Amino acid sequence: MEEAFGQGNTNVIDEVLHSEFVCYDPNSESGEIRGADTIKGEIEYFRNAVPDLTYTVEDQVAEGDKVVTRYTTRGTHQREFFGVAGTGNRVEFTGIQIDRFDKSGKMVEEWPEYDLLGAMRQMGAIPEAQQPGS
């Protein structure tokens, strides 16, 4: 996924994902993103909004058929992203995901959590929180 998100090489998606792949993304309309083509579309959407997007794996832990990845995404918000027109603001947000793999090494399921609120604040869509007493 680092190559797909960070470099825009969505061809690796077909090599990595199982044909019945499901991503349980709480930020998607239905809560689920199914299939390689849909994931490719999501990556293209992110990279269109943030063309200089980087995706850095900070840490990974594997146990059994699951891998947990902690990552940081950085870039410049140039085009519409989650309803927010491009601002030119630098955006950096972190995330963590749990991926489950089958015996052949294909990713079958994913449960991501990422700091969309922080990204929206950096884009200027949501005001920064005020400290009590300020």
Residues of each region from the PLM?
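C-terminal and inter-domain tail/linker signature
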Residues: M1-S134
